[in-house]
Amino acid sequence: VHLSSEEKGLITSLWGKIDIEQTGGEALGRLLIVYPWTSRFFDHFGDLSSAKAVLGNAKVLAHGAKVLVSFGDAIKNLDNLKGTFAKLSELHCDKLHVDPENFKLLGNVLVICLAEHFGKDFTIDAQVAWQKLVAGVANALAHKYH
């Protein structure tokens, strides 16, 4: 993924304002609610039977924060996403057998969460930059599958 210096600036400036725990938990929670088939990878998380159960599930919130911390690693290494996510790609492919399409879904849900949290501060240019980033992360996570 090629990001201009302006796009990198938009990503890093917004990243500094994100509440990792809240936004990460919300993004993973939304993924599980909007795309319920993704919950099969989280059977060990307990009750995921309703939107309320998902959004109140401590394991969902904690794992969502962990996922967003990984996005922080991406932001620190925007020019080497494949290298940054090599081990996670291997884990998700070889051990967890996650459908790589789910990485794209999560990225898009994250962008929706950012738009909701930041409103008009999440400009079209910011969305373009973040869409490129989440696509790059999804690609890097899917790398081991190819």
Curated annotation (Swiss-Prot):
Q: Domain Globin, which positions?
A: 2-146
* Residues recorded with modification S-nitrosocysteine: C93
The residue range of the signal peptide is: none
N-acetylvaline modifications at: V1
Per the record, residues carrying N6-acetyllysine are K59, K82, K144
Q: Which GO terms describe its cellular component?
A: blood microparticle; haptoglobin-hemoglobin complex; hemoglobin complex
Subunit structure of this chain's protein:
Heterotetramer of two alpha chains and two beta chains.
Q: Supply the name of the protein.
A: Hemoglobin subunit beta
